[in-house]
A protein has these predicted regions:
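Transmembrane and membrane-interface helices of multi-pass
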Residues: 2-264
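Membrane-interface soluble catalytic domains
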Residues: 7, 16, 225, 568-699
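Intrinsically disordered, low-complexity coil segments
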Residues: 12-16, 178-199, 463-471, 568-572, ...
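Short loop/turn microsegments at loop-to-beta-strand junctions
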Residues: 61, 507, 558, 624-625
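Residues that form generic nucleotide/phosphate-binding pockets
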Residues: 69, 73, 147, 170, ...
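Conformational gate/switch positions in structured elements
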Residues: 119, 151, 322, 540, ...
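Extended, compositionally biased low-complexity polar/Lys-Gly-rich tracts
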Residues: 191-208, 212-215, 472-480, 489-491, ...
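Soluble catalytic regions of membrane-associated enzymes that act on cell-envelope
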Residues: 218-599, 608-614, 619
Length: 699
């Protein structure tokens, strides 16, 4: 029995770790290599999954992107390896391989999960993981889970995550075995005879610390460490985005979002008197009279010329979900996706250089109806305390004229706090998903179909029409063109089958266009049609294969169509002025006529000085500070990192959308001043609660 016992004891002792600095460093490096391979594999998966965006970009560009990405991956790997580096101070800690394997497996599994999730996130938003993730998590969990379950291959991703986590655990276990020295222990305790003394381990730690600091900084230059802009080394926005690390991007967004001092709010960069005067020069026109100038930035009395008004009584704003300009036939889009909107454009006035102020429905709603821009730190204005401020939108201006109102929507008004926000602004009648009886189709995620919404809209408009009735304004908002693109069966339009990953999106857009066409076909038979101004506008666009500049203008460019009696006779059929959603309210008020006091952050696009090409200030969703100002054929992009120089692009929309960088553009300084002045002054007005028709605080 002595020999078997001795053999058993020998095997047990051989399984115990005799920690050495050399073996521990080898283990750390091998584990780091496993994580680096995982991040490169995730980057490759992101590239392959979104391969439609490659277009004619050469392979060398993506090789450069992957090389750039290694530096960001290495930064995260260094962070995850900190416990292993600290273990150099203790022989017992170095021996705790089981704990290290557990930590690395859990941390890498989380990063793997985020990487898998990011493949569809990027396809949808053309951005790496950012503050939008937290915004969706913050919303109604039932709706979010329903959207994910019905809109994305959740089971497939969960299986891939489980298999990937298992493989990672095997890889870390293999790294442990490959670097585990074997030696006898006395009494089962850790021997320290082969472990370097503490001062030697301290010296090794200092060397490792220096190496890790350099690796985490990502650069040997003096000054700031590697920034996200350092990956923007190619002409392809897709390739540049690939160079980022989604986990790091999400962590940065979390830090910004959870910052107690709200670091993501725009900070003043200019003297306020200068910024305010610049904004006034941008917005106050010849028919405006500035009022309350010592308190309010751009509050003014506007009297539109009588010859530019229209014989209208009512106003109907139709906010179309994800109605992207790049797929509208009248704007040069292929595939016959919007035949009804294309035909409607022949009887109205179509703006072909129009943009949403943001890339989320939330921003489209308050920009279009409340006439307030999308600002850094206030992308979800309607859910913030500042969202309770009285602004200067259509509800305030038309309620003051004793207009009746109605807001018809497929979904739940609680989702973006629409009912709270718009009722506070002056609206009184809300028709949401729970108010529809026997709808043609109801989606468990979002609500009823667009055709149901439009049919109910017809009922509500007719109920408000009549000789003895008040004039009315209405907001009709569609929703079917949103993930998971649940549509009625049988579908009244032909499915799109030749656009790859965009097939479902474009099919839903074609359906929304059909529903819009049915609405107008029925509405034009009603008496109110001949005395109503209809505004059809997209809440935002969506990305496709072509990313126009790093701002991805396809996500912002939307149609804006005005239909009203006599509009073509006075203003023509096509308008090339640059505008955004915050220009809609003053443009409406200009057609109604009569003096109005407002503080809109846009202008009447049909009463601009001769030769004025218009402008627009835009910002993508998320918590970052990247913003841009658009002119007739140029766009200046101001990166979120204030230390980085802005970029000027010359862009083109229509049948051949593209953008190219303009080196040393002469208007860079001018447009940057205008953009920063606009953001700074609008932010100050909102925080000071002086952005409305009247002050929200005592003088």
């Amino acid at each position: 029995m002595a020999i078997p016992d001795a053999l058993s004891q020998q095997r047990a002792s051989s399984r115990l770790l005799q920690p050495t600095v050399k073996s521990h460093l080898a283990y750390t490096l091998l584990c780091a290599l496993v994580m680096m391979v995982m991040f490169s594999a995730l980057r490759l998966a992101l590239l392959v999954y979104n391969r439609e965006m490659i277009l004619d970009t050469p392979a060398s560009t993506f090789v450069e992107a992957f090389a750039n990405g290694l530096r960001f991956d290495l930064r995260l790997v260094v962070y995850l390896s900190i416990p292993l580096l600290l273990a150099l101070f203790s022989a017992r800690a170095m021996a705790a391989r089981g704990l290290f394997r557990l930590w690395l497996t859990i941390a890498s599994s989380i990063a793997l999960f985020l990487g898998l999730m990011e493949m569809d996130f990027y396809r949808e938003f053309h951005q790496r993981l950012n503050g939008l993730v937290f915004q969706y998590v913050k919303e109604d969990p039932k709706t979010v889970m329903s959207m994910l379950w019905y809109g994305f291959p959740v089971v497939r991703y969960l299986l891939a995550w489980a298999v990937g986590t298992w493989l990672l655990s095997l890889a870390f276990k293999g790294a442990d075995r490959a670097t585990r020295p074997r030696g006898p222990f006395s009494g089962g305790s850790i021997s320290t005879r082969q472990v370097a003394p503490w001062y030697a381990r301290a010296m090794v730690f200092v060397v490792c610390l220096l190496i890790c600091v350099v690796a985490a900084r990502g650069t040997l230059r003096q000054g700031p460490p590697m920034r996200w802009g350092d990956v923007y080394t190619t002409d392809s926005n897709f390739a540049n985005q690939l160079g980022l690390n989604g986990t790091l991007s999400l962590v940065a967004a979390a830090k910004s979002r959870m910052s107690e001092d709200r670091d993501n709010i725009w900070k003043a960069t200019l003297p306020q008197p200068m910024a305010q005067q610049t904004v006034r020069d941008m917005l106050v026109m010849k028919d405006d009279k500035l009022v309350d100038g010592e308190i309010a930035a751009v509050r003014r009395d506007y009297t539109p010329p009588a010859d530019k008004t229209l014989p209208i009584k009512n106003v109907v704003v139709i906010l179309m979900e994800s109605m992207a300009g790049h797929s509208v036939g009248a704007l040069g889009g292929p595939g016959n996706i919007t035949p009804y909107l294309d035909n409607l454009s022949k009887e109205g006035l179509l703006f072909d250089r129009f943009f949403s102020n943001g890339t989320h429905t939330h921003q489209g709603m308050f920009a279009t109806m409340a006439c307030f821009p999308n600002l850094p730190g206030f992308e979800y204005l309607m859910q913030t305390p500042e969202g309770s401020h009285k602004l200067s939108g259509l509800p305030q201006l038309l309620s003051a004229r004793d207009f009746d109102d109605v807001y018809v929507y497929n979904g739940d008004f609680a989702w973006d706090n629409q009912s709270g926000f718009f009722s506070n602004q002056g609206m009184t009648n809300f028709i949401g998903r729970n108010d529809f009886v026997n709808p043609v189709f109801s989606d468990p995620t979002w609500g009823v179909s667009d055709q149901d919404m439009f049919d109910r809209g017809l009922v509500e408009l007719k109920a408000r029409d009549g000789k003895d009735k008040k004039p009315f304004y209405a907001l009709l908002q569609t929703l079917s063109n949103h993930t998971p693109y649940a549509l009625p069966t049988p579908l009244p339009v032909e499915r799109v089958t030749d656009r790859g990953s965009l097939n479902d999106h474009l099919t839903a857009m074609r359906y929304a266009d059909w529903a819009l066409g049915q609405f107008f076909e029925k509405a034009r038979k009603e008496p109110y049609f001949k005395e109503t101004l209809f505004i059809v506008v997209g809440d935002h666009g969506f990305g496709n294969e072509r990313q126009i500049s790093e701002m991805d203008l396809g996500r912002f460019n939307v149609p804006m169509l005005m239909i009203a009696p006599g509009i073509q006779e006075k203003f023509g059929q096509r308008n090339h002025t640059v505008g955004t959603q915050i220009d809609i309210v003053p443009t409406i008020m200009g057609r109604l006529g009569g003096e109005v006091r407002h503080q809109c952050w846009g202008r009447d696009l049909l009463n601009l000085p001769e030769g004025d090409p218009g402008f627009g200030v835009i910002k993508p969703s998320g918590s970052e500070q990247t913003t841009a100002i658009i002119t007739a054929d140029q766009i200046l992009v101001l990166p979120k990192d204030k230390d980085m120089a802005p970029k000027m692009y010359r862009y083109e929309l229509g049948t051949n959308p593209h953008a190219e960088i303009i080196p040393d553009a002469p208007r860079t300084a001018e447009l940057r001043t205008k953009l920063e002045s606009f953001l700074q002054t609008a932010t100050k007005s909102l925080i000071d609660n002086t952005a409305g028709v009247v002050n929200g605080k005592p003088d």
